[in-house]
Amino acid sequence: MEEDIWTYQDCKVFEGPGSTQEPFTYVFRVERGGNEAFRYTISADAASVKAHWPDVDPARLNDVDAMWGALSGLGFGRVRAKIDTGDLSSRTLKLMGATELEE
């Protein structure tokens, strides 16, 4: 999966895989006015991906794009909510088994 670029309100969002090996990371980089405003990173190991999406197995080559799509979907609404509230702090969402921890 390559980087995707979209706009929301006055922000430009660049999203895509950060690390393609465990722990997998998916990164949203948000710019406002041409400057980086914040990053939102999702980090997960294979077991956590399977716990959240039982039909997706990162070890299967055919499922890798599905994994990136699932991580993108998980972060999309959270990034928009951060923009809506004006929260420009960088955060990392860690998937640990079926639980989530945002730091």
Question: Where do the protein language model's features map onto the residues?
Answer:
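Acidic, low-complexity intrinsically disordered segments
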Residues: 48-103
